[in-house]
Amino acid sequence: MKISFWPTAWDDYLYWQAEDEKTLARLNALLKECMRDPFRGTGKPEPLGGNLAGWWSRRITREHRLVYRVGGKGDGQTLEVAQCRYHY
């Protein structure tokens, strides 16, 4: 599975690289887990509703969430990250 970041999500990721190594480590662990099994595991994965239907959320910290969706099939799947800072 490939991973792609929206530009704002990439900015969020760079923020964690510069500001908080512990949160960055947690985020990296969640991203790896999402690539293995996007809909189960740590971070309390939950499907989002409303205008975010089709997207999933996992807790990074009490305040921050990872928002993502999976597109494609088989080896062509992509984990698309929309946000990894703040709450949706």
Region roles according to the model:
Residues 1-4, 16-17, 36-40:
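Short hydrophobic/aromatic-rich motifs at helix boundaries and adjacent loops
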Residues 8, 53, 86:
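Residues that form or immediately flank small-molecule/cofactor binding pockets and catalytic motifs
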Residues 9-10, 38:
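Non-catalytic effector/regulatory segments
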